[in-house]
């Protein structure tokens, strides 16, 4: 292992000189061990990642933690490889930082644990799956109108308090219970409080045992925030490639990954590109997204929360992300105000998988008819607000009546929210979802009151609820 010396510290950027031409490779992890001035203080270890070879035996590195206490002249050791993180079943139920160190104050991991490098190549063409397969989530509105592809990338849009976290938890629960699948949650540059809340909520709802969590929050240096998504992805890839699992990878928030890359780029002295972003924006995003895919042995399906700066969808950060997405799930505050959960907007949410070739003719026909009906209802709402229902034609009255039933039937109770709602959660297979909506559109249930459709799973549950309301079914 070659050794060098710190010759310059500029915030999170550290320059290191190696004598004798033994320069570390780009992306190699370097380690500085030092003690602070306090006598009782333990030895601190700082990991650096090589970003540029400057010449004259000097490399410029990015720190993965605070550089407080680092001084010129300190010894730096080249580990000889990129950052490595723990992988395998021991990661489940645990919380890690960007370096793969546990931060949940639980038992330390065994020393002989398998570790993988965070910088890896995307799967080659011959390793990729050639079939297109739907990932059944058990959530009606998602499965019917914006289905997820195995190995696909889904963008999750929504403001504060509209149910992003609950939707994420339910997806983790359903994948674990129905598919025996693993989930990895990567908190990238978001609030520490939210990560803490999510951890305890997942503990309470019982899904933590099938989940590995990785955090690089917004108080950490840009190096940690930029690399933590790769740490989460590396853990997910192991379950796909070695355990042959279908893995869900949640990234919250993908915009912060880009933002951290922009900060690092500026610190390294690169010329900025459009709107001040790094010139390598598309390359960095592509390197991350291309590793998220289906292979012959398993899949990594990614659900990425996306913050849109100033609601400008043409901003280079979200625009670059959109190029990689297969589906979008939009959460709408107006639906939460009506008590419709999950508050997924059925008209704004889209999916590349919603085509007759992938989901089948019947599913496609039912989904497009549901969207047409809801679009007509939306167009009529202004007329209803001004003139009332009586001014509508009989055909439009029927459309509105059915659309309201459809809208309520798109809601359902979640397993992870049972402790708050007192209502049992439901998982609805795609076949039953399609059949239920097909019968509903055909007018089979026009006599059932609207309220019977609210927050239920299968169509049988609607009929059961209607009976309890004293309606003949």
Swiss-Prot record:
Q: Which GO terms describe its cellular component?
A: plasma membrane; proton-transporting ATP synthase complex
Membrane topology type: Peripheral membrane protein
EC main group: translocase
Q: Which reaction does it catalyse?
A: ATP + H2O + 4 H(+)(in) = ADP + phosphate + 5 H(+)(out)
Statement: the UniProt record of this protein carries the keyword Translocase: yes
- Where is the chain membrane-spanning? none
What this protein is called in its record is ATP synthase subunit beta 2
Organism, scientific name: Listeria monocytogenes serovar 1/2a (strain ATCC BAA-679 / EGD-e)
Taxonomic lineage is: Bacteria, Bacillati, Bacillota, Bacilli, Bacillales
